[in-house]
Amino acid sequence: MRKLQALGGAAVLLAALLLGGCSQEATDATPEQAAPAAAAEPTAAPTPTLSVNPLTGLNDGNYANKRPVAVTLRTLYGAQPQWGVAAADVLVEGVTEGGTASLMALYADVDSISRVGPVGPGRDLLLQAALPLNAVPVHIDKNIYAANLLNTLAYQDLDGYHVGKTAFAFDQSRQDAGYREENCWYTTGELIRNGLQSYGASAEGENTPLFRFGTRPEVAPENRNGTNLTVTFSKSDSEQLNYNEGTGLYEKLNADGSPMTDAESGQQVAFTNVFVLYASSGIKDDGYTRQYDMTGGIGIYLNGGAWEQISWTKEDATGPFTLTAADGTPLTVAPGKSFIAIWGGYYGQSLTLTAPDGTAQTLPEKPTLLESGISDEAAAAAEAELSAAQQYVDAQAAVDNATADLAEAESALADAQAALDADSENADLIAARDAAQARIDELNQTIADNQAILSSAPQPEETPAPTEAAEAAPEEAAPAE
């Protein structure tokens, strides 16, 4: 039976909510009569007891009676670079809303966290990777599905929306450098302990191994067929991982191809193991949050520059990932850090993997859609319609802006021409007149080009004004003071 620090909840309700001396007496002997005291033998320092890290399988520390910590990180524009990503034992990523993937960093030892952030809102998809480990979920605010899941299980999280600065801190220098406020909140191991203490909860407790770790055969260079992986979550969000033969690790890159580094340590983010878990996807009842079938599917596993197809199962939200090799035997995972992508394969998502010579690998077919999912054809048609509507809006805005600027440009030309008439041989005035004329020509061309778009594109229907009863999507909250 799986043991959680939190209380269990009803399985049926959970399924619905998912759609802590005595001194010796003196003698009469004189110093001369007293026998010399025996020299005290030095006491050997106790040897630190090492235990296996439940998230990496490495025997490199003391993890007994320590709960892992699962911190949700912000990933939207302006959140990078993030603190603590290279120090994490595991990174889990998957799209929960919109087109940008959500990210969770897992740490086996809370005391190893020097700083992690910017801390983002909790998401139920990510929680399903954390709860089986008896991990402490750490986030700032959370959506309704994450809240329902935690409430059903009576599982205590650490939410900055409630606990505030007891467990979270603000980096003023980061904001002074131009970062938005929500991208400046972070936490540390000490702050996490403080926050848990305020709830009467604890970072001590049982932990569960993430995978079945063990020794794997070394991959010969000629068998390295999976060295460059690109996981596309959307047109605006893709993850690249490239195998480094020197280190034996998969190094994570930013979308622009630059190395992904830790804002705290400056270290390259890299992993021994890379997983892409296929999961059928659809849309939840709010119309925009992603729904995944997390009971199982197929996937790919990368290690040592090679890849293989795997299968995975998961009993429920608190059930661990069970991985099997293609032949049906339990998968042995190499000890080390892991990157886990949960990938729906729906419209706009893709997956490419190449060998060192650039040869593209034939990967398993993408997962099927859930009933609430949108087919590729329907999604493409909707995207085309949206793109056309946006093109019309952009063209109209360009015409309006250019027209507004034209009067000022014509006035500037008149002033430049008047100055030149008074001093016709002045080279600077000639240049100023020519620049003013060029600006007018540019604006007129902009108007003409966008008028052509407006005349050929269908005019989008006007969106009715929202009624008073309409609910707006809640804004993400900053930690409570």
List the model feature ranges, each with a label:
Residues 18-21:
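C-terminal motif of bacterial Sec signal peptides marking the signal peptidase cleavage site
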